[in-house]
């Protein structure tokens, strides 16, 4: 195991330390068919994985899921169990990707990869998906990228997104939340938050596609926001849910007060992971059916 003192200086060690947590995630549903693909991207081919149930019919809706990892770690394998679970629960085509990571590739590289995969989904229609029914979800840094992707798609004429699932997102580069100092989540505190901002945002800390809490959120798709109590990003997610409601966005906010940051990946350790995935699948399916109603935090 890497020396924790080195984690802020060596992103490679961060990645090794994160892999030690993979034991907490159950293997996903092996009945789900998968296909690894390379998606053309502005920064080169993007590794992606397409998930589908064996009984999938053409015209199914789709979900793009964006992994977390503090913008410096993770890949398509990181959320494999959750992505399989979404495909099984919703009957949608689910796509995960390995976007470019900081510090080698700071903003906007990772967001551009997400944009390119979303556009590929809408234009190439893998597994015969319905391009008019695409949802996006993500956790932690991927939650940030989920909101940024919706903003850029709204403002740049990108593919229509029908629903957002936003798990314990990073939203505020000012790090003004005292949760960064008081959270009891091991190994994640203010120093780690400052490191993340430094290597990912660099000089773009005020860009609303990075500090998404400060963006104009009006007109975003219906959203489900999941927050947790033992988390330095607790307030980041709560404030985002409140800002979405204030912007008139149909928003469901569920707070898991007893859960730590990253709990979606801890399916071996807690039933809450599957419960939250059930909720995400349910709300996304309602959006696909056009029956989602306005709920607020």
For the regions a protein language model found, what residue spans apply to each?
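Alpha/beta-hydrolase active-site loop
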Residues: 105-125, 280
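Proline/glycine-enriched tight loop/beta-turn segments at coil->beta junctions
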Residues: 44-46, 53-62, 218-220
